[in-house]
Amino acid sequence: MLTFRKDFNVLSGETLWRDLPGGSGGLHRQHVCPECLTRTHTEMLAHPDVINVRPGTLDNPAVATPIAQIWTSLAHSWAIAPNVRCYEENPEDIEALVGAWRANLMA
């Protein structure tokens, strides 16, 4: 779930992180819970204003209604949600996608 960095904070505890190359070759900083090593969120270093949050780690995952799926080129056909935007890889304009998510959240 993409969101703007200014709208995101970790509510409790600290995370561990590591930098890994993403599909585009750019570095992504992946944050994990230090106790269970579950990924919580990812910073896309090429897009410093955007954070990718894992919805299952939210206190209220109901706020994470999908509006799009990325990297569908690697997904099984049964895993692609109907009625959402699909991108075979990363979308060209991530900020526009985040804006669409925010508009959906406010609706």
Please give the residue ranges for each predicted region.
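A short Gly-Trp-Pro
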Residues: M1-A107
